[in-house]
């Protein structure tokens, strides 16, 4: 074999090896691209207290590891703090609304509770338990609770306050429902990834209060679906940030912005009309027509009210080709969310079969 033929042979081996390496790299790049596509980004949007964080907690219960005893124990002081926050809100509202306590001793109880620094609460001492129970049973406080739309009070107030005896026991461990109902305003961005049928669903929850929305902008890339939550029960409530603006009008304005954003042109939109249980309770004594005069359906009819609210939101979509997928939900009800999210998952996968190499 001549030197030239030996060199040609070595060269062709090098070329072959180089080609093989190149092919491997190309293959890996294609694989990486495919794997990246197997991650679906779901952006959870909605105004403050619409139920986004509760929805994320449900995903952890339904599709993740759930909450261990240790995890639940971590919520104990938050439950206590929620109770104090609720009672303090009602004590302040008693003054604002000029409602009198029926029982004289409750003036002293109110003073005791009012002076508590909620953020420093880590235990639930007997004197506070006793004061809160006596206050909650006062007809004045009950009247104040019935007028809660006139001030800011957590949806979980009644749930916790009617169960103070259980929560006050020594060795109290929050239940799954206690965890779901804890209210902690979301500041910043919370991501929760979970794996379903070899596809990663990355759910992103951003704060709903106005001050938090500035932080949304960088979440807008590669969003598969927008999941927009509306609290059905907020039709007669005012904003935390502005007490002369209706919460549902704010929610509508935000939804209109979202469905018309160029960023979201290719993202599917799923509308969750949440807190259907609270609507059913509230509609019996607070009439939708008083806040939305265009409502011409029957009073005290939850079905008519929710269909009207759904239509109000769907009508904000100017693109007739874009379908708004909608579901009525109760985010604190695990079985309801399990059922609804199974349907949502199927919708998202159907819409993205080709894009995400799922076929």
Curated annotation (Swiss-Prot):
SUPFAM superfamilies according to UniProt: P-loop containing nucleoside triphosphate hydrolases, Transducin (alpha subunit), insertion domain
Description of how the protein assembles with itself and partners: G proteins are composed of 3 units; alpha, beta and gamma. The alpha chain contains the guanine nucleotide binding site. Interacts with RGS22. Interacts with NTSR1.
Ranges for region G4 motif: 270-277
Species this protein is from: Bos taurus
Predominant localisation class: membrane
GO molecular function: enzyme regulator activity; G protein activity; G protein-coupled receptor binding; G-protein beta/gamma-subunit complex binding; GTP binding; GTPase activity; metal ion binding
GO CC terms: cytoplasm; heterotrimeric G-protein complex; membrane; photoreceptor outer segment; plasma membrane; synapse
Keywords in alphabetical order: Cell membrane, Cytoplasm, GTP-binding, Hydrolase, Lipoprotein, Magnesium, Membrane, Metal-binding, Nucleotide-binding, Palmitate, Transducer
Lipidation (S-palmitoyl cysteine): 9-10
Region (G2 motif) residue spans: 178-186
Family to which this protein belongs: Belongs to the G-alpha family. G(q) subfamily.
Residue ranges annotated for the G-alpha domain, each copy included: 38-359
Chain segments carrying region G5 motif: 329-334
Protein name as catalogued: Guanine nucleotide-binding protein subunit alpha-11
G1 motif, as annotated region: 41-54
Compartments, record wording: Cell membrane; Cytoplasm
